[in-house]
Each structure stands twice: as C-alpha cells, then as structure tokens.
C-alpha cells in the first residue's frame, strides 16, 4: 500500500498496489440481498437535520436554528478531538447523546463524522478536488455488457466513480455496487491479494453506503458472468455523513417532497422525471426554432400585475422604495416585443401566483408563452398541437404514452373542438348566450350548487357553470372555444359572434393544459377592458388586472394582429406522465416542518 503525499489532507484516501493479479477463485458476485457487514445498517429514511421530537417521548429543548447549528459543530469538533487523541471509532461516538441531547447527531451520523475525522488525522482528504476518472459507468457497460464469458479478463483498465449502494464482505474480497447518476450500476471487486491487506482493511473501516467511491482497475467478468471492475486502486471521492434510506423500500411522500435529492438516488421514477422534463423543454425550444420563433426573457419583478387573472405575490425594492409584484404572466411584455418588430417570440420561464395548491396548481411554476404576428387562435391551436405531439415523440418515442398508473394515452390523431356556450346550453337543456342575464345565470348556479364568487359577472358565471358540467370529464384532447368577454380582457372579439372572444382552452385528461387567443390589439378597446377590470378590483376581485398605461401606449404604437398561447411545463409533464404537479417539479415548495 502506498499513498501520494500521505500526510497531506489535500490528497485523497487513494490506495494502490503492484501486487500480483487476482486468482479466478476470488471471482464471486454480490447477491441481490447484499449487506454492508462492516458498517451501520441503513435506515428507512434519511436522518432529518430538523429533528421533530414528540413531547410525550422527549422533552426537547427550545433551540434556534443558529443554536442548533452551533451544537452540531461542537459535537463534530468533540468527535474529531477524540479521534486525534487516539480514540477508536466506537469510543469517539456517544450513541445515547447524553452529552449533547436529543437534537444532536444520531449515532449513525456520529460514526460517519468520526470516519471523516480519522481520514483527516491520517492525511487523507474525504473530499478531494479531483480524481483520475477516465470512464463513466455507462460507457463501461455499453462497451462490455454481454460480451464477456464468465471468468473472462480484459486488458481494459478503467477509472470509474459512483455512489456506493451495497457492500458485501467476503473476507479477503469485498464486492461493491457503484451507481452512476442515471442509476446505471456496476460491480467493483477489491481483493486483499491485489490491493494489499492494509488497503482492504482501511476500505472496510472507512467506506459506508452512500459514499462516492473512485475505483481504478481492469474490466473482468466474475465467475457467474457479472461485469466487474477488479480494483488496483480506490479512493473515497466524497464521504457521506447522512445514511441512505433502505433502497428496496418505496420512499414515503414526505421524504420524496422534502428531500428530492434522496428521491433521485433511491427512485428511478424520480430520476426519469427530471430527465424527461429536460427533454420536454428541449423539444419545445426545438419546435419553436423550427418555426423561426425568437426566445426572449422578460421581467420577473413588475410594477403592475397583469397578463392573467390571478392573485400576485408582492415584494418591496428598498433601493427605489417601490412595491413590486412577482409576475403572474409575461404576456404584456411579450406583446411589446411584437410592437417592436419581433414577429415570432416565445419565453420559457417562471410565473408566480399566490393561490391554492393542489394536484395541478403550484404557487411557483414554469410556463411557455408564445406570440405570432399575423396569426390567430386557429393557427396557434395548430402550433400547440404540434408542440405537444412532438414533445411526446421526443420524450417517449410516440404520441401514445404510458402513464404512471400503466394506462395508455394517445395524443395522436385529430383533436376535438367544442363551443363553451353551445356545450353549456346542451348540458342545461336551455339556450345560454352572451345576452343571458347575471340574475338568470346566478339562479341556475344556486339550483346546481355551483360555487359563486364575491365579485361576479356574466363571464364568471358562464365559466363556473361550464366547469361544473365538463371540466373533469374532457379526457381526450379537446379545444374548448369562444369564451365570454368579461373573463378575457386581453383577447380580441370574435369576428362573427357578438359578446364572445376568440379564445380556446385545451383540456387533456380532465384538466386545462394550455390556452390560446386571437390577441386584442385595439388600444381603445383594451383600455375599456382594463377599466372594467379595475372596477372589479375596487369591488374586491383580487385576480383582476391593473391598468397598464405603458402597455396601452405600446399598443398605440401599433401591434400587428397576432395569435398567442400559454402552456404550463409542469402541466405538460402531468399530461405526458400522469404524475401530480409536485412530482413534475424537481424541488417543489413545501411548508416547513417547524412553521
């Protein structure tokens, strides 16, 4: 065994030997039920740094975040001091936490902290800057999988790194399962004859499940044909202080939501969602670029909230002593781009709406909005259909996708269309038109038990009644067309139907996926709509838009006729996979445990 500058902590715990080649009788495999016999057992859930202590179990002290952080540092320093003074790993830890109390590190974390301290004492860096990683686990698999007979050896020396998922100790031989970030695994074998007794002993002493491990050695097949790397060298690439959950058990919902990084390690479905989301966004961008759309970025902080009917988040800018809103939509700025001569424009970015949270709504979400000069709500519907279908093909290889519950859903073929007023009239058995009074609509809503708004108008009542009959029943892709003018202040009046605007909502599997307009570009009519919205706001409607005089001035410069669309990226993933909105967002907002 030899170290590179062995007493300097800037170097890794890097073991190598020039011992003779292994013998074939050392080739054994890790079973499916591998255990780490030298280290602590795994737990059902990762250790939570925010400890919740029930009053009936332990009288936990009241402690601020800073106080607890200082407590944990003091415990870390105490463990390190004991190691420096010659204590063994077992002697350095306090399983019952008599000294530091119930909010201190549990025993498993203490043991890992002690191993970190032991590495530093011996001049080994538990977090080296770099290692001689020359190959990926995926590349080794791709090159050699299925091509070696049991017991075969190659002359291919590789340097790989991955997270330790399993360890099995067979005396003079250790088997380790290493996982790459995408979940691809490979077996590494560490033999006393190859790396030396001291190096193998150190491996057993220091390496835990969850550590990132570097291994350099020859590619072989074990006697049962398992593709393996037979180690000449090994090094800890990153020492994990928190234990992993038990990987063969499904993670509970709380762990998945609060600790998404654990979910990525333990659950292939979560890793796939992250990758599929990235593929979906790339596909959307590619389709827009094929149609000569230009991507822009518009302000997140806005002085006026507009572009959608939603309650905004508010904040304050100290430098200007100015109240601001987190944007609820980029629409008014993207339309300014049309005024400026960018005829095809899109943006993929975050929006914020201070509203309820459920399976299809989140306060922070990602939207794509696009505007096409000289288009309308028909041309933009065709574009959205193409966007969705191409995304399904680019992510899953077909317009027919398999949802998480195993059912199939087909985005191919022709998509249905229906009129909001005609379909509502059919459901009620009586004609509803833009001239139907608020009183009559309110009476119908009361008889049906439909919830009514504090500030209501004809358009809101029509939409609520329509949603009562249809919203969760439109399973196949369906464009619902021609909305009331009152709820669509930024949309152009229908070219042939008075009192109706050229707007559609796209419904998929019972929820709204996207919306599209023929965009209003008459500044006088737009001012009328803004004034009506402002009056609703004064009456208590928190979702009503403000009057944006700068936008009205921009319209006065001249905006070409246009079609526009908006679609939630999170909802697109819901449609493609059957997940909830939280499952599509890599780091969803969750209420803190101590709030």
Can you name each region flagged by the protein language model?
Residues 2, 21-595:
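Class II aminoacyl-tRNA synthetase catalytic cores and aaRS-like
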């Amino acid at each position: 065994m030899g170290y590179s500058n062995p007493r300097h902590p800037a170097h890794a715990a890097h073991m190598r030997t020039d011992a003779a080649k292994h013998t074939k009788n050392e080739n054994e495999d890790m079973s499916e039920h591998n255990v780490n016999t030298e280290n602590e057992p795994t737990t059902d859930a990762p250790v939570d740094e925010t400890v919740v202590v029930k009053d009936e179990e332990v009288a936990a002290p009241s402690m601020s975040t800073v106080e607890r952080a200082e407590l944990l540092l003091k415990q870390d320093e105490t463990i390190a001091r004991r190691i420096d003074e010659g204590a063994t790993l077992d002697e350095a830890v306090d399983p019952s936490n008599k000294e530091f109390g119930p909010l201190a590190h549990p025993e498993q974390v203490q043991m890992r902290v002690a191993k970190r301290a032991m590495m530093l004492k011996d001049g080994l860096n538990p977090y080296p800057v770099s290692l001689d990683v020359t190959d990926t686990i995926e590349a080794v698999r791709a090159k050699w999988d299925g091509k070696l007979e049991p017991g075969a050896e190659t002359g291919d020396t590789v340097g790989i790194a991955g997270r330790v998922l399993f360890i099995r100790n067979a005396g003079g031989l250790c088997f380790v399962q290493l996982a790459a970030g995408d979940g691809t695994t490979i077996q590494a074998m560490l033999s006393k004859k190859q790396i030396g007794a001291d190096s193998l002993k150190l491996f057993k002493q220091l390496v835990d499940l969850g550590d990132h491990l570097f291994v350099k050695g020859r590619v072989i097949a074990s006697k049962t044909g398992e593709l393996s790397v037979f180690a000449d060298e090994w090094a800890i690439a990153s020492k994990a202080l928190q234990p992993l959950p038990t990987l063969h058990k499904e993670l509970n919902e709380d762990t998945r939501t609060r600790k998404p990084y654990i979910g990525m390690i333990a659950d292939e479905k979560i890793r796939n969602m992250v990758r599929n989301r990235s593929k979906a966004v790339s596909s959307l961008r590619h389709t827009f670029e094929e149609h000569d759309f230009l991507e822009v970025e518009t302000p997140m902080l806005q002085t006026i909230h507009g572009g959608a009917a939603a309650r905004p988040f508010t904040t304050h800018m100290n430098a200007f002593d100015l109240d601001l809103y987190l944007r609820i939509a980029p629409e008014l700025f993207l339309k300014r781009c049309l005024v400026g001569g960018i005829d095809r424009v899109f943006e993929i970015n975050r929006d914020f709406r201070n509203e309820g949270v459920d399976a299809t709504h989140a306060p922070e979400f990602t939207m794509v909005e696009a505007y096409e000069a000289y288009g309308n709500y028909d041309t933009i519907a065709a574009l959205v259909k193409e966007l969705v279908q191409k995304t399904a093909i680019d992510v899953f290889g077909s317009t027919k996708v398999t949802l998480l519950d195993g059912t199939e859903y087909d985005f191919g073929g022709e998509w249905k269309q229906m009129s909001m007023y005609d379909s509502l009239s059919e459901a009620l058995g009586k004609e509803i038109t833009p001239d139907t009074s608020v009183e009559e609509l309110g009476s119908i809503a009361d008889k049906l038990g439909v919830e009514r708004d504090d500030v209501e108008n004809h358009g809101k009542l029509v939409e609520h009644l329509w949603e009562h009959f249809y919203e969760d029943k439109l399973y196949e892709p369906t464009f619902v067309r021609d909305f009331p003018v009152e709820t669509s202040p930024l949309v152009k009046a229908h070219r042939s139907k008075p009192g109706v605007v050229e707007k559609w909502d796209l419904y998929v599997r019972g929820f709204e996926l996207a919306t599209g307009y023929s965009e209003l570009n008459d500044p006088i009519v737009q001012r009328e709509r803004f004034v009506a919205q402002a009056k609703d706001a004064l009456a208590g409607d928190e979702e009503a838009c403000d009057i944006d005089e700068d936008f009205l001035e921009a319209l006065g410069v001249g905006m070409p006729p246009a079609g526009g669309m908006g679609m939630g990226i999170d909802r697109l993933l819901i449609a493609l996979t059957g997940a909830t909105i939280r499952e599509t967002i890599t780091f969803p907002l969750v209420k803190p445990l101590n709030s």
